[in-house]
């Protein structure tokens, strides 16, 4: 038991990663507070599930459009220096929202514009953060570090909504914006204080025409990359839309307020933390783990869709959260391990595109389905998509296993 726990937290023995872990927990908690405030504010101002879905879409549309170039920037610029810039730019949106909200003039179109701007910064920031993990811990601990990264992401999903639910219900949305801006300032301090001598910087990509296309060709000829990416594209588009579905589930299905929404998000977060800690004890990722995680995620989505009461929904979302993080962390780790260092930024940008950038398609679809039918219908869609995606990935892995080792399989 003690040995397993030690393996789960092994990467925290590295000073830079330990410092980064702390900074990200604070920063991501602030980010979740802001996202909860944004979603509830849009729902309060418009009463529209489509508007909530559109807000989610605007946040991630830049990743879909610009993500590949964001990954190229991550391959060409020292990652710590680039993160210092993106964290500074990330402070602009919450400070602007705070000023507008305090003046009582924050309209939906203003919020949409600022959410889109934050998404543009994130199209560079997200793939850079993913690739930077390898530079802090090395290949021997990247699976553990990615899992611990998932722990802090979903720990923030518990902490942020819990604080946001209390603040919105008692004071309003303004403190959420202020605390998020402060959290980015803390992350800047964390990055600036790292011991650069302990980092393992990847080889910088050469500046040549067609570098983005070269990254796409590299993924296309590498089954260990395109199969997990294809699986995540399916599940990411149709399944990972909880930012749009959960506020509608809280409001339309269970007739609750911000505290109900926060409870649903926190339940998924608790389950995700447990799942990430279990996943962190592994040192490798197998194809069957990817397939199994997708199918289990699909089954648990269908279970959550059938929960008849709020209490049972909260219970059902916890194991769904564990399955969510197991699939995402397993795909992330497998891509990091299979990528060449000079291509890692572009590969992780493609992961970012299918994981987050697919939301502009899935977010509005889930929002529309939730409003036109029921939020449970969006969970049914997620479940079916994940099961189908897992089965397709199994078929693809079986085909690859039949190819001689010196041959390459490219998708048709």
Model-predicted regions and their roles:
Residues 1-412:
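Alpha-helical transmembrane-bundle signature of multi-pass membrane transport and export proteins
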